Amino acid sequence: MIELENITKTIGGKVILDNLSLRIDQGDLVAIVGKSGSGKSTLLNLLGLIDDDYSGRYEIFGQTNLAVNSAKSQTIIREHISYLFQNFALIDDETVEYNLMLALKYVKLSKKDKLKKLEEILERVGLSATLHQKVSELSGGEQQRIAVARAILKPSQLILADEPTGSLDPENRDLVLKFLLEMNREGKTVIIVTHDAYVAQQCHRIIELGEGK
């Protein structure tokens, strides 16, 4: 599914990823760990087709070394990848409904059926009453659960999570982790960048980066 071979990435003359090679198969549950500045988020951006400024070979979903703005890259992002970021990446001044509908933008369902899916996912994450609330009215833990709900809604094969529990209390951390593990059990590949040893220990594999290697 994903294969990196001799990937090197430099920023401002500094080597961030240094001749990195790895393979991630469909259905894997992977933690990427390492000290700050070791290249974890840089690697995730590369995996998610957010960054194409590197040397080496990168294959994802059968396509090799795609340019970020290429039609094939955008199709893969649209159809196969969900992102879950520490800062939630929600639109604060819009409603929960608006934010979740973005995950179903390219799904061929009626508005009624999409709303039903939204109601079901909000019940699953314990936020049934928030559909018409603005995101800015929710707590940090609630916003992250909405971000998780959006990732679950999108019919993706690959979930990329960058410190998804980093700013959460233990209760909300465990909820977010629970949903990520559930997505993996449904057959999705889940890759988590984390500083949390407990989160990493729940994964099938741990990739530790040190000075980009």
Task: Map each language-model feature to its residues.
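Conserved ABC transporter NBD signature motif
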Residues: 56-67
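Short coil-to-helix segment of the ABC ATPase nucleotide-binding domain corresponding to the Q-loop/switch region
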Residues: 94-102
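Conserved ABC ATPase signature
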Residues: 134-138, 142-144
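Catalytic Walker B motif of ABC-type/P-loop ATPase nucleotide-binding domains
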Residues: 159-162
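Helix-to-loop junction immediately C-terminal to a conserved catalytic motif
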Residues: 48
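Conserved signature/switch motifs of ABC ATPase nucleotide-binding domains
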Residues: 78, 133, 154, 186
